[in-house]
């Protein structure tokens, strides 16, 4: 919904959690699981690459969602000026970013963002450190 949706970080996180749960939220099926499955299946990778987007190898785009099959596997909804909703299904993780980039398209920020998310996921997989203090 380019320039047509206004949501708080919490609301976007709820949408992400619903997508993570294959369309379920608040104890009920909100959208059919088959619709979510279709969204996250992604589009034609070769057509995506032929479109000239070179910084997202292996990704695809379908039905307003960007799909990354590379580790850590994710799908994302990206809005103008840096608004982002990332879902990492293998890690049960939803990340919301509300940005204020000076340009409406901030695609090159996806590279450092995805690296940061990969580092976050690696850290979350490690056991918690204890300091010995109560």
Regions found by a protein language model. Name each.
Residues 4-24, 83-99:
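Active-site-proximal alpha-helical segments within enzyme catalytic domains
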Residues 22-23, 43, 124, 128:
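A general structural signal marking secondary-structure boundaries and capping sites
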Residues 23-31:
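Structural helix-adjacent loops and short alpha-helical linkers that scaffold large soluble proteins
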Residues 37-94:
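Active-site Gly/Thr loop motif
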